[in-house]
Every structure is written in structure tokens, then in C-alpha cells.
UniProtKB/Swiss-Prot annotation:
Residues 48-71, 90-120 are annotated as: Disordered. Residues 1-19 form the signal peptide. Transmembrane segments: none annotated. One of its GO terms (cellular component) is cytosol. Residues 90-103 have a biased composition (Basic and acidic residues). Keywords: Signal. It comes from Arabidopsis thaliana. This is Uncharacterized protein At4g13230. It comes from the Eukaryota. The keyword DNA repair does not apply.
Length: 120
């Protein structure tokens, strides 16, 4: 791309702001007319600056909202992980107790069986 094409492309992608300011002053005007044009130009510049500030504030608010949503989502996910881990622990502990009781019962049965055989 030529440098002109690059500049043309950048210009077409730039945000556009329209303000009604005459492109040239008319000769022989009074100072009040000049002041009026200058006031209009200043007013247009202030409007553009105000719009830019409003846009920046909107973007800042949106970023803050996204940050809060991400934080809440992470906290909810962490709470779910903790709950699931607790359920797994309770299940494993319960099964361990059942297995322990089953082993004790089997050991007593084997012991009785051995005692019965030894008596005969």
C-alpha cells in the first residue's frame, strides 16, 4: 500500500464528529461576528470533549461490571468445588465405616467357625 492509501484508510476508520463552523471568515465582518464564530468553535470543541468523556465513563463502567461478574462467577465455582469435595469426603468416610464394620463381622464369624471346628 502506498502511504496515501494507508492515510486514507486510517482517515476512513477514524470516528467522525460534525460541528458547524465556517471554513473561512468573511472579510469586512465586525468583531462581534468573529467572536461569535470563535464562540461556536469553542462550544463545538467542548461538546466533543464532553462526548469523549461520557464514552470513556461508559467503557469504565462496563469494565467494572465485567470485573464484578467474573469475581462472582469465580466465587460461585469455588463454593461448588468445596461442596462437592465435602460430599465426596462424607461418602468415602461412610463407606470406610461400613467396610470396617463388615470386616469385624466377618472376623467374628471366622473366629466362631474356627472355635466350633476346634471343639469337635
Amino acid at each position: 500500500m502506498t502511504s496515501f492509501a494507508v492515510v486514507a484508510r486510517l482517515i476512513t476508520r477514524a470516528p467522525r464528529v460534525r460541528a458547524s463552523v465556517p471554513t473561512r471568515l468573511v472579510h469586512g465582518t465586525t468583531s462581534t461576528r468573529k467572536d461569535s464564530v470563535c464562540d461556536k468553535a469553542t462550544e463545538a470543541q467542548q461538546k466533543v470533549a464532553k462526548k469523549a468523556d461520557e464514552g470513556a465513563q461508559t467503557i469504565s463502567d462496563a469494565a467494572g461490571n465485567l470485573k464484578d461478574k467474573a469475581k462472582n462467577t469465580a466465587e460461585e465455582a469455588w463454593d461448588k468445588v468445596k461442596d462437592t469435595t465435602e460430599k465426596i469426603k462424607d461418602t468415602v468416610t461412610g463407606k470406610t465405616e461400613e467396610t470396617k464394620e463388615s470386616i469385624k463381622a466377618t472376623a467374628k464369624t471366622v473366629e466362631r467357625s474356627m472355635n466350633t471346628k476346634n471343639l469337635k
